[in-house]
């Protein structure tokens, strides 16, 4: 995630890992869910993290330049050399090329595709590198608007926290 309405910084999660007392921060995607887990033993820090996460998930900026950086773009293979061949680059594109470079990953994805031909499990949740370059910025925006909404979310927490305060924060920042 590359910033939000309240936090228009380039990478709020990286900024928080350096400034937070968190004991855990991450984001993970599977075939039919995405999770944004975090933990902190400090109440003020927990609430700061909650604020950043809620805003980043439900009010993401999703600028086209961020899509090019994170998703895919075309660059010269040798920076500054316009005579070098063009190649696809991008954070997710490169991560998925690496993830799908093992025989086990390819076998698992191939089996899943055949076992689940008509469900979300048919697809690689991170994206097939051969198809990532077909994704447009507009398609990403439409997917985000359709799926990243509080009505499509489950909020879970545990620990010694005031549930009423937590509920009020969700109401004020995500469910309004």
Model-derived regions, located:
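Conserved alpha/beta enzyme-core scaffolds, especially Rossmann-like or related mixed alpha/beta domains
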Residues: 65-75, 147-149, 157
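Second-shell loop/turn segments in exported
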Residues: 2, 34-41, 75-80, 97, ...
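Scaffold signal of the M16-like zinc-metallopeptidase fold and its non-catalytic homologs
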Residues: 2-5, 48-63, 80-151, 164-176
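Helix N-cap motif at beta-to-alpha junctions
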Residues: 42-45, 159-164
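M16/MPP (pitrilysin/insulinase) zinc-metallopeptidase core fold and M16-derived inactive scaffolds
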Residues: 1-55, 59-60, 64-71, 101-105, ...
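Residues in well-ordered beta-strands of folded domains
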Residues: 26, 37, 93, 112, ...
């Amino acid at each position: 995630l590359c910033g939000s309405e309240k936090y228009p910084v380039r990478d709020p999660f990286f900024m928080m890992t350096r400034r937070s007392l968190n004991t855990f921060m991450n984001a993970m995607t599977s075939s039919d869910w995405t999770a944004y887990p975090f933990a902190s033993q400090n109440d003020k820090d927990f609430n700061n993290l909650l604020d950043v996460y809620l805003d980043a998930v439900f009010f993401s900026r999703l600028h086209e330049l961020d899509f090019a950086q994170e998703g895919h773009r075309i660059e010269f293979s040798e920076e500054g050399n316009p005579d070098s061949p063009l190649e696809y680059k991008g954070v997710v594109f490169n991560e998925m090329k690496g993830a799908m470079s093992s025989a086990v990953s390819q076998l698992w994805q191939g089996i899943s595709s055949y076992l689940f031909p008509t469900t979300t499990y048919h697809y690689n949740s991170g994206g097939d590198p051969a198809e990532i370059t077909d994704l447009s910025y507009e398609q990403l925006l439409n997917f985000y608007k359709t799926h990243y909404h509080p009505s499509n979310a489950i909020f879970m927490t545990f620990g010694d926290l005031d549930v009423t305060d937590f509920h009020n924060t969700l109401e004020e920042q995500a469910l309004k």
